[in-house]
Every structure is written in structure tokens, then in C-alpha cells.
């Protein structure tokens, strides 16, 4: 490798004389315990940090100069979100709007965490009816907001969302693209995601399937042992009289205390 060539995780970019948008590889393989999902989705890694498989997007605005005047904004999309946007172009949507916001990190002394906003739209015409040469508008805004924990939904639905009206923008940048430019960005990124999955998922899937098969085999053996003759039962001295109903000294209170069975789920922090 030539000494003047610097490795990069950049997948694709579009650059004009004033702005730039680029997509970056931030993909991570799922742990063996969750091999079938392929992509990491917030599980804890070996350093006890949470890892998610993402595609990074950066928009730079150097219309006012480079250096300190260069505005750089960032946002992360899930791989399937990139493919979702690609499908919108392939289907041929003439008008389209989609947005997403994220909040993460430890709150500061004032209770604010890092927050990001992403907006993408397509409109064919200006308000005066003129056809737009670059109908796609992509905007990224970075700032801070107050996070609120979501206690509803299933395990993977739980997390944080941004409190309404708490967002404080620090910087933002946008870019306008035509259909071909955006299609090229998304298509090349989608191709990278698919090839990454084929290269990285192979060993994980094999090891995960083997681990899962071993787990099922262990469970079956344990069940067979419990059902075998002579295996000690939980209540060997059980008789039907044990559960004979008798008057209770505590009126209005059941004498039968029900205890929820205790299950341990192999759910990592998300």
C-alpha cells in the first residue's frame, strides 16, 4: 500500500463546489446469541458498550469557506432504512417525505443529551409550478435535547425519545440532489450492505446455529431426565388433601398465594 493512501470507511459520496454528502460503513455483526438477526441492534459488546449496525451519513457545507467555516453534520441510519429509501426511488415516488430523530448519550448537568435530526423529501415542482432540477432535499441537524424513557412496547421498543420542544440546534446542513445522484448513493450503499452481510454473516450464522442446536439438545436431555422413572418429583408426598379448601382466618383474603414463575430471558441491554 502506498504511504500516501489513507484507508477510509467511506462507501459513496456526491460533491459539489459548495457541499458534500457521503455514506460510511458503521456496520457491526450481531452476537452469536442473536445470530439470525445478522446486524447488531444495541447489544452489549466485550467492553460493556452497546453496539448497533449503522450506515453513517455526513453532510458538509463549505459555501462560506473551509476550516472553521466548514459545517459538518452527521446522522446514522439502520441498514434497512437505507434500503427503504432506495425502494422509494425505484418505485418512482414523485412526492415523498420522511424524517427521523435520535437522542443518546449521558445527559449533561442541565439534563441535555446529544440529539440529531434527519429529513429527506422529494417534491417535483416549486411553489410557482416550475420543475425542480434537484427534487431531493436532505437535511441533517445536530444539537441537544432532553431524553424521555419509553416504558411501553416490547423489549426492543423500549428506549429513549426526545421531549417535545426541548431540541436546541447547534448546526445544520442540507443538500439538493437529482434522482440519479441520490439513486447512485443509495444503490452503492445497498450493494455494500448486501456484500458485507455475505462476507461477515457466514461464520456467525454457522456458529450461532451450532450453539442453538446444542442448546436445544441440552434442553431435550433435561426434559427426558425429568420424565424418566425414578426421577425425584417436586412433591413426592403429595396427596389430594393438600389442596382441600378450608375456611380462612383472614376474611376476604385468599389462602392460596400465587407466585409468578421466575423466568430469565437472555435479553441484552439495548
List each language-model region with its residue ranges.
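A cross-kingdom feature marking solvent-exposed beta-strand/loop segments within repeated
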Residues: 59-78, 156-174
Amino acid at each position: 500500500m502506498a504511504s500516501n493512501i489513507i484507508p477510509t470507511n467511506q462507501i459513496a459520496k456526491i460533491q459539489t463546489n459548495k457541499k458534500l454528502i457521503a455514506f460510511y460503513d458503521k456496520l457491526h455483526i450481531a452476537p452469536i446469541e442473536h445470530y439470525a438477526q445478522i446486524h447488531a441492534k444495541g447489544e452489549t459488546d466485550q467492553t460493556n458498550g452497546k453496539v448497533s449496525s449503522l450506515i453513517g451519513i455526513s453532510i458538509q457545507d463549505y459555501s462560506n469557506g473551509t476550516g472553521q467555516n466548514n459545517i459538518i453534520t452527521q446522522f446514522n441510519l439502520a441498514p434497512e432504512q437505507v434500503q427503504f429509501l432506495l425502494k422509494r426511488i425505484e418505485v418512482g415516488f414523485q412526492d415523498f417525505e420522511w424524517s427521523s430523530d435520535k437522542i443518546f448519550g449521558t445527559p449533561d448537568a442541565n439534563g441535555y443529551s446529544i440529539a440529531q435530526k434527519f429529513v429527506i423529501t422529494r417534491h417535483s415542482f416549486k411553489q410557482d409550478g416550475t420543475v425542480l432540477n434537484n427534487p431531493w432535499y436532505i437535511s441533517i441537524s445536530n444539537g441537544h435535547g432532553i431524553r424521555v424513557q419509553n416504558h411501553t412496547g416490547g423489549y426492543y421498543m423500549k428506549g429513549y425519545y426526545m421531549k417535545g420542544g426541548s431540541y436546541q440546534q447547534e448546526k445544520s446542513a442540507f443538500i439538493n440532489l437529482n434522482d440519479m445522484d441520490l439513486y447512485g448513493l443509495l444503490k452503492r450503499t445497498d450493494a455494500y450492505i448486501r456484500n458485507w452481510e455475505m462476507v461477515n454473516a457466514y461464520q456467525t450464522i454457522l456458529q450461532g446455529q451450532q450453539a442453538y442446536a446444542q442448546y436445544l439438545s441440552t434442553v431435550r436431555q433435561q426434559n427426558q431426565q425429568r420424565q424418566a422413572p425414578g426421577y425425584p418429583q417436586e412433591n413426592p408426598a403429595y396427596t389430594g388433601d393438600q389442596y382441600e379448601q378450608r375456611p380462612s382466618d383472614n376474611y376476604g383474603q385468599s389462602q392460596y398465594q400465587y407466585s409468578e414463575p421466575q423466568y430469565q430471558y437472555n435479553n441484552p441491554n439495548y
